[in-house]
Swiss-Prot record:
It comes from Paenarthrobacter aurescens (strain TC1). This is Phosphatidylglycerol--prolipoprotein diacylglyceryl transferase. A 1,2-diacyl-sn-glycero-3-phospho-(1'-sn-glycerol) binds at residue 146. It is a multi-pass membrane protein. Its main location: membrane.
Amino acid sequence: MQPLVLPGFFIPSPTVSAVEIGPLTIRFYALCILAGIVIGAWLTARRFRARGGTTAQAMDIIMWAVPFGIVGGRLYHVITDNQLYFGPGKDPWGAFRIWEGGLGIWGAVAVGLAGAAIGARRTGVRLATFADAAAPGLLLAQAMGRWGNWFNNELYGEPTNLPWKLQIHNMNPATGQAVLTADGTPETLGYFQPTFLYESLWCLAAAALLVFLDRRYKLGAGSVFALYVVLYTAGRFIFELMRSDYANTILGLRVNTWVSALLFLAALAVFLILRSRPRSASTAQSACSIDGFDTRANGHDPEKHDETDGKGNRHHVP
């Protein structure tokens, strides 16, 4: 039974998660994901330039990583929550309605990384260089994406009377509107722990910590991305234990709790191995490989240069 909620402060949730403009339905969940992609791409390009690359190269890789990541995130969600789409009375086509919500971060990261590998290979950039540059941006994107769950009134914890308790409405996913009571007011399911907010704030803090540690200690190539996985999974493990919405379980624990624990251990081991290696960035080097960025990919070979004769004419000297 839900505890009695005393009067006081609470975090309100929207009663509308979508708007219709003519025949087009705009989901706020999708807008949050899009905003996260834009912010993450901006920070990634900025950090990638500091590692010897260019904005154009960063965007080329991002254009591969993003669609792969979205597909991977959806696949992970559908596989781990297949009962939502398959079985008696279920609609399998719902698995394709990504705008209604449902992306698994681990599928997004894994398949997105595969897309980034393709883009990095095509642009002559080492994957570790791009991954290290992208790590804080991924956390910013995840922090923004969690607000899509706020619009959908989902991903909350146990009932609570804390001052920052989250109001949750009974939402109709088909219409993007809260279900109304007999007197015409939005139906409230209760007040719960705002786990979406906890995770969003954790991602912001982890992003700031990553940037600080990368600058302070010049972490080795690939270790920044490994540390991103360590930090995120540490928080996600705790937040999964707090959540009260339905999820498939293994031995009494949510699937994502197990995944977070296993990835934390694996990423921690990788970080300890890679942290002392040479850094994946150096804007001061003029060697053929600028710490992971192959200058020959742009047609420039630092072993070749131009000289000017006494008449001002330039001659290419191999």
